[in-house]
């Protein structure tokens, strides 16, 4: 672009943009400019300094072209015009003659033959107005003396887009110019599909622009006045503001490509780092990165870089989120976002080293150094054994922007698992259980979860020395406690099996079908059963798969026994090997056998009552054609609407024989081939799904080989032989021992870290809790009417697993005081004074394991103390409170207070969280009315807009916040 200089008074030097824009604005010239004028030649006289350094025949727009010539004298004008019109001069049909001569100096006959019959004067702003299709121009825009020429020079092909309303404002014009020059917004040729709001010129847009290769140089190549003007415009408050000023100062210092990385370091230094001499020294080095012309000094510079750092963190956070979109047209943009983010973070780390800002970076919520520092903080907290400090450290770790990155997910989950194990150990878990049944129930509800958390940690560990050491110590403590628990369980198991007593109410592998599946058939339930037997699935894996399944299925306790429903477990047959325990499962009696025996015995069980039933093994899943999901026999059984189906899935057992899980210790539905497809069919068919196993397993992470006194029969059991038992062995005998024959005696390893045979990923056959416990999970599709006796389960995670999600733990049964009647007669309705006193009791004793309620024995009797549960006291005080009564009075249709009482009691006893359908079932109403009942509860409890009763994001689970309940209804602090 050329400078605008004065040749003679009244004549300015025109450039290509001005001339072409002028020609485009002349509608009478369009045909000739495009060659559609039938060969008609036109001459145009423009007042200009007779100088031209542009192309002799510029081409622009859609096939438009013209010739340009200069005429410093009247004679030159005459000759050029006449020669062109007479076609003696070659070139396009339109010739533009640039001259500084006055009109009276020219022959009127010449003027009569040119465009407009005169020498036309080009007003740059008129041309700009025409280019934007405007009627008026903002006077403030005309005050920008460099803008007209810049707008004309930057005119895009096809001209500028028409301005809305006909008013060309300064904001609109300079925004369009900046977008065109910097290739932003509608002129971004590299950013993919445009989205709403992409035309903005805020700090985020400029940060995005600065990360493009070569983008900052586009600003530096502009002429001085235009570059300075656009820089000032972009730094205005309505545009990119202070952050934009800072970024453009970096561009001016030729460091624009580092802007985003520099901003992250600035955020660490000026926002997050603690004031310290090292911080101030690093700030000084960072300030010099602006070169000789910083955008400000002193406090003003501090303010600039603080705002810039904040904007940069927001930008990188947006990029990180964009990098997670992998579907459809977003995939390419997501890949580009990940590339950009990686480049920026790497460069920021390099700049931090250059500035000596490593300690400041440790406080960053965005930079990798900050993430590593937070992992280290978790390690220190775990090493200190302070569960509160661990919770704070894990929370800060989860809040780091990089914590959501897929490559960090397993590592973050390990930190959570470490927190959970620390909380578990803090409860000082007892090592003994009263009975085998108690131990099995506890394993599914507690110790199996500890096994799950431990496996996650040991699958990956951590490369950071502090966290690695903390995991090592934590793992050792957990294994020691689990070893004590397993030792106690093995003694109980040996005593029970030797005594030969019946299991009683305890679920066992041989009674499972009769007690769980049989009632569905005997009651004439129309619903079929799909039993999925995941060979070798431990309680730890079952709990993990169960949590994933609960997102799409409702889980039930299939047994009607006991006051509180819970996830069930059953005892395996002994030894805990497939030939014994799985065959016993399918045969409905203690026995040993093969797949052929299972296929024969399972459908012959009397419990089917003549209904068809079939069991399918690994080979039955093999397809014969590309379009099939399962083998033909399994496909037919699933689709016939009559057959009860059992399918054995071997992924877990097969994995034990091959390799350990490394890095990510999680088991997911998709890790078990065929499981998701089978679940999909079951949902479509409305089948009840029972997820179980034939035995569990132990994982070998620290195993040692035990030299057996007799040849081993499996990795974890042997026959009775000479010599004393080893420390980690126990003798099992009695009717539950089926190998090598019923009633035999075997020796089994109870220690999870021991084996007899060669090293593998894991083993079974022994007497540990993880091997003997068989988890049994029952599911129905959401909204399905449950079979009689099936009770929907709430959150099954132990309270130490996720206390922030599960609410307060319900009191253990043995510590819950039962109401004790003071007299044989039922107490009368309390008086107003008694109600007040009882509410006071609730406030005074909310922290106790049990409360003392006051009841009356007669109209004039003294108040008599009665021991009641803490939950009962709280609910009674709530229902009698003035606030609750006012809420109840505002309802047009009032619910039965007995149902409200039972619902609140159930929620509190369940830790505060329960599915809507489960709540309806516990209250004694149809599950279809659960949603409506929950809405009424919300109206009663969510006083003054506070969410005392909350519906979780899944749309089907309620959470009652006991602390808020006490606060809102003035029942005392929780």
Curated annotation (Swiss-Prot):
Keyword Nucleus: no
Effect of residue 694 to A: Does not complement Pgl- phenotype of C-terminally shortened protein
Keyword field: Antiviral defense, Toxin-antitoxin system
Entry comment on modification after translation: Identified by mass spectrometry as a slightly larger than expected protein, suggesting it may be modifed with a low molecular weight adduct.
Induction: Constitutively expressed, not induced by bacteriophage phiC31, probably part of a pglY-pglZ operon.
TM stretches of this protein: none
Observed phenotype of the null mutant: Strain is no longer resistant to plaque formation by bacteriophage phiC31 (a Pgl- phenotype).
Biological-process GO terms, alphabetical: defense response to virus
Record has Hydrolase as a keyword: no
Region called Not necessary for Pgl+ phenotype or antitoxin activity, residue ranges: 835-974
Function: BREX systems (bacteriophage exclusion) provide immunity against bacteriophage. Part of a type 2 BREX system. Previously called the phage growth limitation (Pgl) system, it confers protection against bacteriophage phiC31. The bacteria allows one cycle of phage infection, but subsequent cycles are impaired, protecting the original bacterial colony. The system undergoes high rates (10(-3) to 10(-4)) of phase reversion, i.e. loss and regain of phiC31 resistance. Probably an antitoxin component of a type II toxin-antitoxin (TA) system. Inhibits the toxic activity of its cognate toxin PglX.
Domain statement: Deletion of the C-terminus (residues 835-974) still allows this protein confer phage resistance and act as an antitoxin to PglX.
Stated family: Belongs to the alkaline phosphatase superfamily.
Name used for this protein in its record: Alkaline phosphatase-like protein PglZ
This protein's encoding gene: pglZ
């Amino acid at each position: 672009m050329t400078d605008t200089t004065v040749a003679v008074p009244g004549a300015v030097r025109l450039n290509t943009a001005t001339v072409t824009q002028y020609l485009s604005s002349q509608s009478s010239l369009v045909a000739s400019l495009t060659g559609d004028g039938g060969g008609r030649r036109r001459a145009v006289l423009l007042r200009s300094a007779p100088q031209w350094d542009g192309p002799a025949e510029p081409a622009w727009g859609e096939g438009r072209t013209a010739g340009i010539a200069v005429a410093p004298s009247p004679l030159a004008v005459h000759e050029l015009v006449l020669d062109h019109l007479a076609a003696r001069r070659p070139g396009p049909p339109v010739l533009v003659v640039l001259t500084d001569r006055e009109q009276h100096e020219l022959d009127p006959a010449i003027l009569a033959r040119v465009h407009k019959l005169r020498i036309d004067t080009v007003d740059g702003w008129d041309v700009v107005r025409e280019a934007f299709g405007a009627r008026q121009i903002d006077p403030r825009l005309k005050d920008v003396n460099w803008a007209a020429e810049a707008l004309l020079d930057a005119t895009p092909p096809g001209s500028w887009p028409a301005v809305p309303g006909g008013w060309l404002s300064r904001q609109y014009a300079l925004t369009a110019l900046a977008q065109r020059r910097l290739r932003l917004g509608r002129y971004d040729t590299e950013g993919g599909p445009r989205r709403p709001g992409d035309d903005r010129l805020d700090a985020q847009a400029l940060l995005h622009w600065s990360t493009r290769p070569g983008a900052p140089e586009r600003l530096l190549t502009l002429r001085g006045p235009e570059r300075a003007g656009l820089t000032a415009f972009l730094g205005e408050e309505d545009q990119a503001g202070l952050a934009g000023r800072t970024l453009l100062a970096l561009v001016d210092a030729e460091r624009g490509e580092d802007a985003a990385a520099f901003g992250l370091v600035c955020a660490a230094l000026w926002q997050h780092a603690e004031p310290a001499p090292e911080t101030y020294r690093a700030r000084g080095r960072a300030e010099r990165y602006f070169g000789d012309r910083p955008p400000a000094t002193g406090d003003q510079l501090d303010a600039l870089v603080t705002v810039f750092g904040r904007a940069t963190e927001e930008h990188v956070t947006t990029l990180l989120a964009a990098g997670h979109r992998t579907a459809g047209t977003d995939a390419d943009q997501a890949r580009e976002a990940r590339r950009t983010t990686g480049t920026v973070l790497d460069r920021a780390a390099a700049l931090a080293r250059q500035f000596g800002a490593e300690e400041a970076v440790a406080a960053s919520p965005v930079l990798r150094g900050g993430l590593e520092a937070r992992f280290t903080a978790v390690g220190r907290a775990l090493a200190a054994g302070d569960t509160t400090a661990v919770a704070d450290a894990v929370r800060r770790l989860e809040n780091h922007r990089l914590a959501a990155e897929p490559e960090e997910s397993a590592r973050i989950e390990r930190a959570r698992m470490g927190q959970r194990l620390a909380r578990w150990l803090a409860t000082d878990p007892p090592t003994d259980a009263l009975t085998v049944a108690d131990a099995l129930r506890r394993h599914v509800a507690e110790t199996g979860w500890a096994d799950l958390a431990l496996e996650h940690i040991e699958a990956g560990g951590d490369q950071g020395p502090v966290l690695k050491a903390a995991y090592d110590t934590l793992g050792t403590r957990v294994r020691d406690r689990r070893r004590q628990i397993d030792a106690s369980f093995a003694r109980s198991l040996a005593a029970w099996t030797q005594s030969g007593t019946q299991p009683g109410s305890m679920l066992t592998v041989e009674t499972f079908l009769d007690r769980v599946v049989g009632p569905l058939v005997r009651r004439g339930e129309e619903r079929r059963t799909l039993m999925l037997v995941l060979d070798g699935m431990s309680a730890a894996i079952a709990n993990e798969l169960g949590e994933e399944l609960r997102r799409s299925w409702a889980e039930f306790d299939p047994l009607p026994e006991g006051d509180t429903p819970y996830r069930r477990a059953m005892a395996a047959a002994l030894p805990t090997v497939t030939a014994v325990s799985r065959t016993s499962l399918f045969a409905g009696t203690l026995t040993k056998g093969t797949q052929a025996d299972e296929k024969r015995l399972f459908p012959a069980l009397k419990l089917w009552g003549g209904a068809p039933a079939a069991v399918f093994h690994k080979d039955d899943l093999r397809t014969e054609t590309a379009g099939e999901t399962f083998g033909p026999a399994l496909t037919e059984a699933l689709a016939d609407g009559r057959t009860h189906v059992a399918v054995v899935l071997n992924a877990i057992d097969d994995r034990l024989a091959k390799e350990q899980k490394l890095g990510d210790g999680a088991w997911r539905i998709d890790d078990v081939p065929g499981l998701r497809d089978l679940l999909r069919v079951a949902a479509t068919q409305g089948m009840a799904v029972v997820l179980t196993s034939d035995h569990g397993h132990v994982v070998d992470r620290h195993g040692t080989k035990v030299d057996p006194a007799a040849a081993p029969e499996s990795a974890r059991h042997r026959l009775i032989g000479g010599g004393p038992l080893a420390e980690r062995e126990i003798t099992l005998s009695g009717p539950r021992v089926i190998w090598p024959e019923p009633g035999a005696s075997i020796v089994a390893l109870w220690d999870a870290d021991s084996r007899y045979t060669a090293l593998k990923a894991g083993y079974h056959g022994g007497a540990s809790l993880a091997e003997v416990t068989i988890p049994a999970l029952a599911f129905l599709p959401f909204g399905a009417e449950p079979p009689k006796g099936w009770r929907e389960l709430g959150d099954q995670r132990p309270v130490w697993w996720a206390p922030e999600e599960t609410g307060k733990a319900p009191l253990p049964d043995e510590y819950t005081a039962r109401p004790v009647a003071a007299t044989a007669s039922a107490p009368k309705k309390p008086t107003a004074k008694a109600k007040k006193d009882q509410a006071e009791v609730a406030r005074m004793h909310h922290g106790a394991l049990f409360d003392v309620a006051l009841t009356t024995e007669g109209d004039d009797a003294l108040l008599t103390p009665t021991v009641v549960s803490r939950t009962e006291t709280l609910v009674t005080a709530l229902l009698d409170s003035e606030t609750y009564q006012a809420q109840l009075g505002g309802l047009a249709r009032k619910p039965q207070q007995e149902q409200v009482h039972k619902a609140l009691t159930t929620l509190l006893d369940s830790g505060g969280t329960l599915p809507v359908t489960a709540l309806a079932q516990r209250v004694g109403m149809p599950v279809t009315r659960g949603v409506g009942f929950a809405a009424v509860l919300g109206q009663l409890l969510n006083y003054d807009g506070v969410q005392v009763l909350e519906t979780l994001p899944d749309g089907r689970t309620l959470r009652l916040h006991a602390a808020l309940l006490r606060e809102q209804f003035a029942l005392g602090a929780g």
